[in-house]
Structure formats: structure tokens, C-alpha cells
Amino acid sequence: MIKSILIINNHGKPRLIKFYEHYSEEKQQQIIRELFLLVSKRTERSCNFLEIGNNSNIFDKDTKIIYRHYATLFFIFCVDSSESELSIIDLIQTFVESLDKCFENVCELDLIFHIDKVHYILDEMVMGGLVLETNPTIIFSNYEIQNKLEKAENPLLSGLAGVMQTIKPNK
């Protein structure tokens, strides 16, 4: 099972945080700090899989860290021992490809200004720590459908707001 998914920039600023297990706010902050320290000090040639084992007082013994470093961002998945490392690496690649399709060459600013859409894309792929979809074409198609629905709703909402402003109660 996937325990958490994080995107952290090179300076340690979290850009996306998704926990599939309940942790207190303090523990979440500890996890973010420890994950950044673990992955940021590794070289480009290092393996992208980390077995935590007994080396941490934050994570369970069976926790594995699987990450990829793209440009200025670390895509980090914390999983239990039942998950395949290679399938999670593929899932990270699928996530990045889906983001690239949706944002036409995704960058860190897209994650900052469109975090709701990033969460939507992630929720198309993973729900409750379980992988739902791994096909970027299907993920992008669902994203496009959602965008069309949002655009169809907005004229109604803005038109309703305009009508409400023109109606003034009699005093």
C-alpha cells in the first residue's frame, strides 16, 4: 500500500503532500523533513529505492522510500513492503507524464498555482493508497472531461451572481 506521496523542491519546500495514513501535523512535518534529508543528500547515480528498516524512528520497519528527481522537484512515494519498487517507479513516471500532458511541460509554478488540478490528477491514479489507473491517456481524458464540466458550470455561476446583484430588496 502507498502510505504517502510528496513532491518537494530542491530547497525542501513541499509542493504536494498526500498522506494515506493518519499522522498528526507534527509527525507529518517530521516525515517531510526526514524524507527531504534522505533524498536530497543522495547523488544522481544512487539507487532510487531506500529501505528504511530500523534506521528511522518515524517510519515503520517495512517502509520503503521510492523517489525520482526531475529538474527541481523530488517525487517521493512512501510504500510498505508489499509494493513493487519498479511498479512505483513506473507510477511516478506516469504521474509526471500525466502532469506534462495536462500542463504542457509541467514546472514547479504549475504545482503551486494549480494544486487543485494536480490533486485531481493524483486522485485519478491513487485513491486510499491503492493504484487505480496507470494509463496517462485515460488520466488526461478524465482531466479534460473535468475541465469541460468546470467551464460549463462557471458561466451559470457568474450569470447567477450578476442576476443576484441586479435584484435589490425594497426597503
UniProtKB/Swiss-Prot annotation:
Domain of life: Eukaryota
Signal peptide coordinates: none
Compartments it resides in: Endosome membrane
InterPro entries: AP_complex_ssu, AP_mu_sigma_su, APS3, Longin-like_dom_sf
Any single GO BP term: Golgi to vacuole transport
Keyword Nucleotide-binding among UniProt keywords: no
SUPFAM superfamilies reported in the protein's UniProt record: SNARE-like
GO cellular component assignments: AP-3 adaptor complex; endosome membrane; intracellular membrane-bounded organelle
Alphabetical UniProt keywords: Endosome, Membrane, Protein transport, Transport
Subunit structure: Adaptor protein complex 3 (AP-3) is a heterotetramer composed of two large adaptins (delta-type subunit and beta-type subunit), a medium adaptin (mu-type subunit) and a small adaptin (sigma-type subunit).
Family: Belongs to the adaptor complexes small subunit family.
Its biological purpose: Part of the AP-3 complex, an adaptor-related complex which is essential for the compartmentalization of the endocytic pathway.
PANTHER family the UniProt entry points to: ADAPTOR COMPLEXES SMALL SUBUNIT FAMILY
Name this protein carries in UniProt: AP-3 complex subunit sigma
